[in-house]
């Protein structure tokens, strides 16, 4: 397990807000395999989606939803009900390819050829809404980010919702292209373009085997180990996925840092102190 700690504004206050990363999963798929992923069998132990639910979904939504299903499938017992959970979807540049193709089609063939699905499926909120509706989660759901700072904005939004909403937990879903694909004249991307999704389930709890710490500007560092942080360190989504996997395997070397534009530090590392408490 992992935990999240939001350091308090007052340096004299020793209590933080802690959340487990109760489960997480990463899914990567090349563009050529995403059509099959829309209709792929669900992971053993994961809930099913309505038939053809992802038929018109953007690639970010397909990969992000699959990451959530994988994380649910590996959720440790006892698995909670997710009915009241919130969802934060934080994609980086979603809907770009479909939007480009639509604009080209509009210019060439007129408005009658434009699909009505383009607006709801390519909006910033499409990912979060699909997870919430498809998996019957009735907590707040919101799309955040959409650009290069999607990770930082996703983390701070998620912790804000957990701190100020009466919800038992929250799914935070990040998506991005491994390398943002270059489209051809028809708006088509290379078939080997790789889309990545990382799903993280956050729940209030005690410390786990690792921790994810957000230190706000002007606050004290959570521990001496946090003094290692450097303003130049900016962890990527791929590195976050690797750190989460390492923490789940008990790797004491796991250490990931992302410095937000406004100065907050987001860090995940193995929590050796929690090992001693077991």
Task: Enumerate the language-model features and the residues they cover.
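Internal, well-folded beta-alpha domain core
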Residues: 153-160, 164-166, 195
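Short glycine-aspartate micro-motif
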Residues: 170-172
């Amino acid at each position: 397990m992992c935990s999240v700690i939001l350091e308090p504004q007052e340096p004299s206050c020793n209590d933080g807000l802690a959340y487990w990363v109760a489960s997480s999963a990463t899914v990567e798929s090349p563009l050529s395999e995403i059509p099959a992923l829309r209709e792929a069998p669900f992971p053993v132990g994961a809930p099913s989606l309505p038939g053809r639910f992802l038929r018109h979904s953007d690639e970010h939504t397909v990969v992000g939803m699959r990451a959530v299903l994988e994380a649910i499938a590996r959720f440790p017992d006892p698995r909670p009900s997710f009915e009241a959970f919130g969802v934060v979807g934080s994609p980086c540049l979603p809907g770009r390819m479909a939007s480009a193709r639509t604009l080209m089609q509009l210019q060439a063939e007129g408005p009658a050829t434009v699909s009505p699905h383009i607006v709801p499926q390519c909006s910033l909120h499409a990912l979060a809404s699909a997870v919430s509706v498809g998996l019957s989660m009735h907590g707040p759901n919101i799309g955040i980010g959409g650009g290069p700072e999607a990770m930082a904005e996703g983390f701070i939004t998620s912790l804000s919702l957990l701190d100020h909403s009466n919800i038992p937990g929250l799914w935070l879903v990040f998506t991005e292209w491994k390398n943002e694909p270059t489209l051809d004249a028809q708006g088509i991307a290379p078939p080997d373009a790789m889309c990545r999704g990382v799903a993280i389930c956050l729940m209030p709890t005690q410390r786990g085997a690792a921790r994810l710490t957000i230190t706000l500007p002007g606050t004290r560092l959570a521990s001496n180990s946090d003094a290692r942080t450097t303003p130049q360190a900016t962890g990527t989504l791929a590195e976050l996925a690797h750190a989460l996997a390492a923490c789940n395997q008990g790797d004491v070397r796991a250490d990931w840092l992302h410095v937000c534009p406004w100065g907050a530090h987001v860090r995940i590392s193995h929590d050796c102190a929690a090992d001693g408490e077991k």
